[in-house]
Amino acid sequence: MRQNQLIEKITNEQLRTDIPDFRAGDTVRVHARVVEGTRERIQLFEGVVIKRHGSGISETYTVRKISNGVGVERTFPLHTPRVAAIDVVRQGRVRRAKLYYLRNLHGKAARIPERRRG
């Protein structure tokens, strides 16, 4: 077995299959596992996906939310075991793959219309 095939086999075993289909503009709730000392707990992070980056085992996504009037962005690896679950709260209708322009918008201007299902 060549090295490329071996790496591909190992990464395919580590890919998660329980990830819902979501894209930039969707509002998601990420259940992140946080270790504090000897205890482990679930911390929720709900916000708008502003980008997805990469492919395969190294794919990441960035979620943005406003907390106490301050914009907070957090980047998660898609296939990490540190994320217990990802819930899609609502699907947004956007025309871009990267929503960096949301960083400069405030209030109602930063809202994303909901995508129609059909």
From Swiss-Prot:
Keyword set, alphabetical order: Ribonucleoprotein, Ribosomal protein
Cellular-component GO terms for this entry: cytosolic large ribosomal subunit
One protein family per Pfam: Ribosomal_L19
One BP term from GO: translation
Gene3D superfamilies given in the database record: 2.30.30.790
Signal sequence bounds: none
Keyword Ribosomal protein: yes
GO molecular function: structural constituent of ribosome
InterPro entries: Ribosomal_bL19, Ribosomal_bL19_CS, Ribosomal_bL19_sf, Translation_prot_SH3-like_sf
Family: Belongs to the bacterial ribosomal protein bL19 family.
Its job: This protein is located at the 30S-50S ribosomal subunit interface and may play a role in the structure and function of the aminoacyl-tRNA binding site.
Family matches, as PANTHER family: LARGE RIBOSOMAL SUBUNIT PROTEIN BL19M, RIBOSOMAL PROTEIN L19
Protein name: Large ribosomal subunit protein bL19
Organism: Lactiplantibacillus plantarum (strain ATCC BAA-793 / NCIMB 8826 / WCFS1)
Gene (name only): rplS
